[in-house]
């Protein structure tokens, strides 16, 4: 395997996990710059993690750029652009740069704009796993540097999957996926808090598990195609669920939002459009919704 000089901008949970495991895999040169590494409440933690892994902590973006050829941004997404602006004056055509923070495509495009005059080849990355995956943490990558970053780091055990040449594609996949994944987390909280108040948490979880046991594409298709026909009934049931939660002192934030969304679908009169027949595909269902939905800010529920 070819040695590379790798630098992390940020050394929190993701950066420290990858840094330690890459060093363990035999990568000789791993360094990091983190604003909190030498001053702040987490300085001791950052220094301890880096010291244990043999990762060099540097004191400036300039030092990191001088020492490393591949730079990985692992700051919070809110700091992606400012971090790119700080290191941009120190990058050259020898550098590859990938930002793997969770952020919108617009933010990742702003990162690329901040680095545009540097000569560095830039990629947008998004993490679709968790730190417990370790070095095999799944990362989607897009943009001009995506394949080069993959070729340099996959031999060391990283899991990087290029998904296209356009900056922002990887982050769009991740952030839109989060609509569902983060929603599931919030819905589980609400469902099981209510079930706990009724003394039925195990039974409700088991019942939901059976419903969700089908392959996910099949489940999604079934819900979307039947949803355009049965939105009214499902909205009413969501309203009942919200009342049941409120009756035991659980605020039904997610359930009321679900009720409102289903009422919104019902108002599009899709049952009439399809003549009461379930559409052939989820794509047909979504196309019908999109064709009838009011413009953003134009009213509707």
Residue ranges and their predicted role:
Residues 173-278:
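Helical "substrate-binding/catalytic lid" subdomain
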